[in-house]
A protein has these predicted regions:
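Conserved catalytic alpha/beta core of Sir2/sirtuin-type deacylases, generalized to analogous enzyme cores
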Residues: 1-289
Length: 289
């Protein structure tokens, strides 16, 4: 029904759209937040530039990749080096606080509303900011979880203790061999619980969150709903963006709002139901408070 080529960008001054979104948020019976990588980037979780140089300059010098994301695909020659990189990566993106209070400001906007969050982010920022865990659906995994690489089971395993130990004890871009994580059931290597292929483990908690999200959609079908999209691009639009467009098109009472600098757009078919704010997410949320 929709495609990127059919969208219209909203590039004018966003003051009117900010006020319109304030009013819509106030009057909405239900708010469904869809969050992508742009929201965490607005909170300061950037994967290149100064932050990358601060934590990974040694890896950059040795392996010549220019950002954290690219490093995640590098074929490190040993598991000790692989986990030295990934433990650092996980530690700074999962077990440190976001530099800016973007998620906290978002919570202030919806704390008194009937809300639910669906996100492709894996950095735990929503829970760290105080969002209700029962109102969150992390579709793509969590940096804070390991899974069997086979996988031999549908379990995930908390990794905070071992990640902290790896980062503390690594030297010369290597962790001690005894810290290499293995599956407690089959002894095969562990990996991150991140959706990359058909080996991604959707554990019991994942399925419970998915059901809560679907239940929220079903039970609010007769209410005035705001679909609030924040920082979602086109890497995986079928998870948040396209469903939000489709659900808005099916319900004349629904409103679709998109805050995303450079990608504030909506299909022409739902233009009259859309509020697109072409602005920095952090600044826009501050203006909405």
């Amino acid at each position: 029904m929709f495609s990127r080529t059919s969208t219209e960008k909203f590039t004018s001054d966003c003051s009117a759209q900010i006020e319109q979104l304030k009013d819509t948020l106030c009057n909405a019976d239900a708010v469904i937040i869809g969050a992508g990588a742009g929201l965490s980037a607005a909170a300061g979780f950037t994967y290149s530039g100064e932050r990358y140089e601060k934590y990974f300059s040694d890896f950059e010098k040795k392996y010549n990749f220019g950002d954290m994301y690219s490093g995640g695909f590098y074929p490190f020659p040993t598991p000790e080096e692989y986990w030295a990189y990934w433990s650092r990566y996980i530690f700074i993106n999962r077990y440190t606080d976001a530099p800016k209070p973007v998620y906290e400001n978002l919570l202030k906007l919806v704390a008194d509303k009937d809300y639910f969050v669906i996100t492709t982010n894996v950095d735990h920022c929503f829970q760290n900011a105080g969002f209700d865990k029962k109102r969150l659906f992390y579709t793509q995994g969590d940096y804070g979880l390991f899974q069997c690489s086979v996988p031999c089971c549908h379990e995930t395993f908390d990794n905070e203790a071992v990640i902290r130990e790896m980062t503390r004890k690594q030297e010369n871009m290597r962790i001690p061999s005894e810290l290499i994580p293995v599956c407690p059931h089959c002894g095969k290597p562990m990996t991150m619980n991140l959706r990359a292929d058909d080996k991604f483990v959707e554990d019991e908690g994942w399925h419970q969150a998915a059901e809560r999200y679907e239940s929220f959609l079903r039970t609010r079908a007769d209410q005035k709903t705001l679909f609030l999209e924040l920082g979602v691009g086109y890497n995986t639009p079928v998870i948040i963006k396209y469903p939000f467009w489709q659900m808005t098109a099916k319900d004349p009472r629904a409103v679709y709002a998109n805050i995303n600098f450079g990608q504030a757009e909506a299909p022409a078919a739902i233009r009259d139901q859309s509020i697109c704010i072409n602005a920095d997410i952090a600044s826009a949320l501050e203006r909405l408070l």
